[in-house]
């Protein structure tokens, strides 16, 4: 897009983003114990007839490499009565609309909306959640039926994909809330990081809880699969 002469005060220069984003990714990986081994950063600027054209946003890709056994890579089929579990951090006004905001021009939304869409990292909580998942995978019998990360759309996306066509009911009063000013929509749709959604066999819940306590990872049983092919969130007052 056309680069104007005035840059919004909340924006960073491409150079700052290239340096700080790269440093931030490797810093998080080191804190978490997962080295950053590949990635790239890219920006572009071009002057033509006294007008400057360039990327409004810098592109950064980063990643690591891992492996898993075939047994632990294939998801199981949800059955009625499976427990829906969330492991990790609380809900905050973080990452709201992150998937949408990242796909439009900078400045399209208000600064408040764009700030709420920005992610905040917590490497320690990520490590705790990771330790629980790894411990369960390394057991002789893996009690995890299915697992999903909390990406775009938060609980709405994660938990609905966990229960799949089996259907499920989520008790919103069981979801951990770190900011009491959150609305119901913000609670179920925020993208606060360092959380995993798991589908656990009912008889294994207490065992999983002990593993989570050992790793100091907050664990919440927030609902269960229903078998009625419907997915719903229910508030404390019974409203769905």
Q: Can you say where each PLM-predicted feature lies in the sequence?
A:
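Acidic/histidine-enriched ion/cofactor-binding microenvironments in catalytic or ligand-binding pockets
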Residues: 69-90
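Short, Lys/Arg- and Gly-enriched loop/turn segments at beta-strand edges
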Residues: 89-101
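Polyanion-binding loop/helix "lid" in catalytic or ligand-binding cores
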Residues: 113-152
């Amino acid at each position: 897009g056309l680069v104007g002469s005035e840059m919004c005060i909340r924006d960073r220069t491409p150079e700052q983003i290239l340096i700080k984003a790269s440093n931030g990714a490797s810093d998080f990986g080191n804190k978490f114990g997962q080295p950053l081994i590949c990635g790239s950063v890219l920006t572009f600027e071009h002057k033509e007839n006294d007008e400057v054209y360039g990327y409004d946003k810098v592109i950064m890709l980063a990643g690591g490499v891992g492996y898993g056994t075939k047994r632990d890579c294939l998801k199981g089929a949800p059955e009625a009565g499976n427990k829906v579990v969330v492991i990790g951090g609380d809900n905050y006004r973080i990452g709201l609309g992150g998937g949408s905001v990242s796909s439009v021009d900078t400045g399209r939304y208000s600064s408040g909306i764009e700030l709420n869409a920005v992610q905040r990292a917590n490497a320690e909580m990520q490590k705790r959640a990771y330790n629980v998942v790894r411990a369960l995978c390394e057991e002789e019998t893996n009690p995890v039926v299915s697992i999903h990360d909390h990406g775009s759309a938060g609980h709405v996306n994660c938990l609905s994909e966990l229960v799949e066509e089996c259907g499920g009911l989520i008790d919103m009063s069981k979801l951990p809330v770190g900011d009491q000013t959150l609305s119901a929509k913000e609670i179920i749709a925020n993208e606060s990081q360092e959380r995993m959604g798991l589908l656990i066999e009912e008889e294994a819940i207490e065992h999983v809880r002990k593993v989570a306590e050992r790793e100091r990872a907050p664990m919440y049983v927030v609902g269960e699969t229903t078998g009625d092919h419907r997915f719903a969130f229910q508030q404390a007052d019974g409203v769905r």
